[in-house]
């Protein structure tokens, strides 16, 4: 059975990757590519925009019209667009995959409300490798407990606008949940000046923004005489796009609810 997929944010870096990824996936069909009204790319051929040759599908700017033909929408846009995307999918009953990061509490609450009506997948990262890293981070935290200091270091390209990354926060949340800690209370974001001795109950976050780094995440568990580092490095954004398409094929036709990539992968 073919899954009919629409993409919003089609002219963006990830949008173009998604167009290519849908074309490469078995059992998936791109039925709509949408960009913001007024975009210079509206009317362009989606395939030519993605660099894969002409598809005969023009980029549009009417999201609800695009959803009428789709089983599922993939959204990699900006947090301020999330509310409109959720409302459009609720109106049309369309399943949704959200890859947008940097969502605030109000946007997350709106996402949960939408999950009462439509099936949606929300994940900070759609890479299979990153989601395995989340599982490994949980296993390490469970085994090591409070005997180690835990730091999360992430690096991305200079154009990324949110920090720490959604993936770094997800890693921190997974570790905190495993250890029975409240991440809001124990997270330390960067250090400067005379900080005093480190509190072992804290989870540290360090952020690097430089060059064209696609994405790197390390969870460091440092104890007496040894340390463990769990690291994932992405060398190409196509891994994220392919994972999002996999999630779209998985969520189409599911019961309403909020799912994540761990559900998609059966982890």
UniProtKB/Swiss-Prot annotation:
GO terms for biological process: diaminopimelate biosynthetic process; lysine biosynthetic process via diaminopimelate. Keywords: Amino-acid biosynthesis, Cytoplasm, Diaminopimelate biosynthesis, Lysine biosynthesis, NAD, NADP, Oxidoreductase. It is found in: Cytoplasm. The active site is at 156 (proton donor/acceptor), 160 (proton donor). It comes from the Bacteria. Pathway: Amino-acid biosynthesis; L-lysine biosynthesis via DAP pathway; (S)-tetrahydrodipicolinate from L-aspartate: step 4/4. Its main location: cytoplasm. NAD(+) binds at residues 9-14, 35, 99-101, 123-126. It catalyses: (S)-2,3,4,5-tetrahydrodipicolinate + NAD(+) + H2O = (2S,4S)-4-hydroxy-2,3,4,5-tetrahydrodipicolinate + NADH + H(+); (S)-2,3,4,5-tetrahydrodipicolinate + NADP(+) + H2O = (2S,4S)-4-hydroxy-2,3,4,5-tetrahydrodipicolinate + NADPH + H(+). Its EC number is 1.17.1.8. (S)-2,3,4,5-tetrahydrodipicolinate binds at residues 157, 166-167. GO terms for cellular component: cytosol. It is an enzyme of class 1 (oxidoreductase). NADP(+) binds at residue 36. InterPro entries: DapB_C, DapB_N, DapB_N_CS, DHDPR_bac, NAD(P)-bd_dom_sf. Belongs to the DapB family. Catalyzes the conversion of 4-hydroxy-tetrahydrodipicolinate (HTPA) to tetrahydrodipicolinate. This is 4-hydroxy-tetrahydrodipicolinate reductase. It comes from Alkalilimnicola ehrlichii (strain ATCC BAA-1101 / DSM 17681 / MLHE-1). The gene is dapB.
